[in-house]
Amino acid sequence: MLISETTPKEYVSYLEKRNYDYFVVGDEHVDLRQALELFSVKFKAKKVLTDTGRILGNLLLEQGLVDEVNLLVHPVIVGEKSYNVFGNISQNLKLKLRKQEKLDKGLVWLVYKVTN
């Protein structure tokens, strides 16, 4: 669990009572760069995978902490209930296609390197 210095004490107590591990990374907000550095040192992590949806992914992209983007293209056009996966990113990101693979059921897997 990642928390900041300003995480409410009640929530920290909640984590401690349940014996959840947590790491304080950041003053007012969780500092994602600091969190990734911690993962590298403490857990010897060289790669991190996130598939939590657009919020965390967009934050990591926005802060320049992503070097590769994997996309699965499904053979379906979604109507009015769709949303822009990258809608919260304020700047254009340049990508270079590294891999493309056709999968079962018409899916296509695209792997891009972030180049900016």
Give the ranges of each region predicted by the language model.
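Enzymes that bind and transform nitrogen-containing heteroaromatic metabolites
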Residues: M1-N116
